[in-house]
Amino acid sequence: MSHFPKLLSSQIAFDVARTMLDGFDKHYRLFREVSVQAKTAFETGDWAGLQQLQRDRIAYYDERVREASVILEDEYDAENIDDEIWRQIKLHFIGLLTNHHQPECAETFFNSVCTRILHRSYFNNDFIFVRPAISTEYIENEESPTKPTYRAYYPGTRDGLGACFERIVHNFQLNAPFEDLERDIGYVVRAVGEHFGDFRIAPNFQIHVLSSLFFRNKAAYIIGRVINGDKTFPLAVPILRNAAGQLSLDTVLLRQEQLLILFSFTHSYFMVDMEIPSAYVTFLRDLMPRKPRAEIYTSLGLQKQGKNLFYRDFLHHLQHSSDKFIIAPGIKGLVMLVFTLPSYPYVFKVIKDYFPPPKETTRELIKSKYQLVKRHDRVGRMADTLEYSDVAFPLSRFDDDLIKELEKHAPSMVEYQRSEDGGEEIVIRHVYIERRMTPLNIWLHEGTDAQVEHGIIEYGNAIKELIAANIFPGDMLYKNFGVTRHGRVVFYDYDEIEYLTDCNIRTVPEPRTEEEEMSGEVWYNVGPHDIFPETYRTFLLGDPRVREAFLKHHADFFEASMWQGYKERLLSGQMHDFYAYDAAERFVNRYGASAPDNAAQDNTTLQRAAA
């Protein structure tokens, strides 16, 4: 049973708690400043600056945790504070969070500082927040009524949907001109009419729009919901900027599946200015009820909060399940030992202690590759990973074959201990956790002809989008790619990735002799960063169905000129345009040049109906 002091008598306890909260408040202030700067970068088309903001922000959390830990060590000798004082520190911290707007994130920051200062064998659940202590329900921003979490709009007035949406756009106060906002709003109204058709407008017909834009890649997104009667529908509108500095509304997304892809774990984190992050998460969860809160926090750039919630969800699942962790099905990797819990939709990846030929790498190099992916634009084609250290699992839940594999291939990563209740635990010293997907090689082997064709189209698109983002996957075997539940192909094996601009793209030289021509070995010199696209045929086109689909849709994949073209554009400073939605949904592809007149007519019809 937890023991808590009846009297908070320590000044040091209060001072330590105050120092921790000051550290978090500094972190969140800097976090929000990045989102404000992202708006300026978007308005001016500073795409490199936008990417740099994204990379810098990822490092902020750990920097503030280190900073707070150093202060506590230097000023309070925190490592030697006794148990009674630590319990008081936690209670003081809870008191300081009264009326705080980010209490859940502050609690996570508190945990991070504690676990950094105290060895895992010392700190216990009395010292940290295993569960949240402060509710995030109904937190309101009373200090700034001009910027609530969301604004409500009522298109059922005589002004109609067009005028309503014009107010929505203008309220974001973007400091850049629109190319033709009237045209774009006409497109929006037309698309909404096509999607919903004839529907009866209820008395509560309204649109709620989150007060901050969502910035990512070269786009800013308006995110909201449409409420009519007892129905709620998602609303997302990407805003793009052209080379002339003019803005346009690119499309309108009205289906839950589209929003799920927009907030997928395969995309980089959004930059959003949120005073009350829990309110944004609640709003988004209303639109995506199947999406875990952990993933929503992560997609909003609060990856440590997402990581904390994921672990709580994981412990809850362990408590309410009984199946065992097993070696993940499929082809075993040379670098990673992968295991899974069948009842849980994730895989756990442990770096092996040694790597058989032809792998030439190290543990630190592999970790640096995963960190590169964390910092880089994943463009919807690379799975995000959660990285944990010293994770304790119930030993009884591990299959015997899995334990043998761990002890054989990663003995330095495994140790055993007794839990607080006396049970046996296996501790994994370092592990990556990723969403479980269907391996592409299995998809292609077992799928119908239509599924094979879809898989190959997606595979080729995924590679092309990755190299457009300056990522060369390295090992492009189908087993290193997965298929998500939305049918998208995603890369998830990062130990051989390189920047495309660091690669030397070559064609295989003509053989000089008959011996070279007949040789089964590579007879020409190959440097460490040389790539030969024409040789990919050998290991990608073995299956006749795969070959037919590949040559039909991606014949240029095996031409060095295609790869070189992407590299040259990157070296010239060009940034590719990526869309987190089907390009067919874009207004330019849906309506083309003749759309404005038709859109205006649809706008009038909807206005009349709304009135």
Swiss-Prot record:
One GO BP: glucose metabolic process
Q: Where does ATP bind?
A: A328, P329, G330, I331, K332, G333, L334, K349
A GO molecular function term, named singly, is: protein serine/threonine kinase activity
Alphabetical keyword list: ATP-binding, Cytoplasm, Glyoxylate bypass, Hydrolase, Kinase, Nucleotide-binding, Protein phosphatase, Serine/threonine-protein kinase, Transferase, Tricarboxylic acid cycle
Instruction: Spell out the InterPro entries in the cross-references.
Output: AceK_kinase (IPR046855), AceK_regulatory (IPR046854), Isocitrate_DH_AceK (IPR010452)
| Entry keyword Acetylation | no
UniProt EC number: 2.7.11.5, 3.1.3.-
Top-level taxonomic group: Bacteria
Location comes to: Cytoplasm
Residues forming the catalytic site = D384
Q: Which reaction does it catalyse?
A: L-seryl-[isocitrate dehydrogenase] + ATP = O-phospho-L-seryl-[isocitrate dehydrogenase] + ADP + H(+)
Gene Ontology CC entries for this record: cytoplasm
Quote the function comment for this protein: Bifunctional enzyme which can phosphorylate or dephosphorylate isocitrate dehydrogenase (IDH) on a specific serine residue. This is a regulatory mechanism which enables bacteria to bypass the Krebs cycle via the glyoxylate shunt in response to the source of carbon. When bacteria are grown on glucose, IDH is fully active and unphosphorylated, but when grown on acetate or ethanol, the activity of IDH declines drastically concomitant with its phosphorylation.
Query: To which protein family does this belong?
Result: Belongs to the AceK family.
What's this protein's name? Isocitrate dehydrogenase kinase/phosphatase
